[in-house]
């Protein structure tokens, strides 16, 4: 490859997940030309860790502020109040991860919708981009997003798992599709989505420490594996890995103003 670098648009690089080798994980990412990583926030409790590591690596790690849908519980309003206070932090590049997750637990179904709307309002007020998590709830999430159509939201549908209709709606409404290591797995539909939408609609992500690509499937994931995802996308689209790197980096820098 020529000069240039990758961006991992979604990775949970917290010390909680890498207690023994955090610095080495960052160094390995940089060695593999993954020079920028966007760090989603999942709850108020994750803020100290996120801000600590982003201060350590200010040129490489870029924090978001948000409440993950599976972290929505009976005290979600107080969590949102704490998170909202940090929106003005000059290092924060976006909001997320927020969204709808009906796969794990529907106990706080209504609260998830309310928390999602609150964070979409933050995006409207601050003009910050979004990292959106949707699992088993595309129709529900899109019904909320459509209320904000006039707000001209932008962002990434992280770890995209929808069909082609959802993909086209997202792209038409200012969102990139976050493509993770799942694209390297055998018998997955994500490769068909990638073929259909093309490289201009794609952001690379690991979702580390989860969803490691083949041949590391089932093991701890890290940002250094982004080139593996890029190689698979290059193969699917019949373009060079250099082009995947260049265009996806431009895509993510445009969305998050990195």
For every predicted segment, state its role.
Residues 1-258:
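Mid-domain alpha/beta scaffold segments of enzyme catalytic cores
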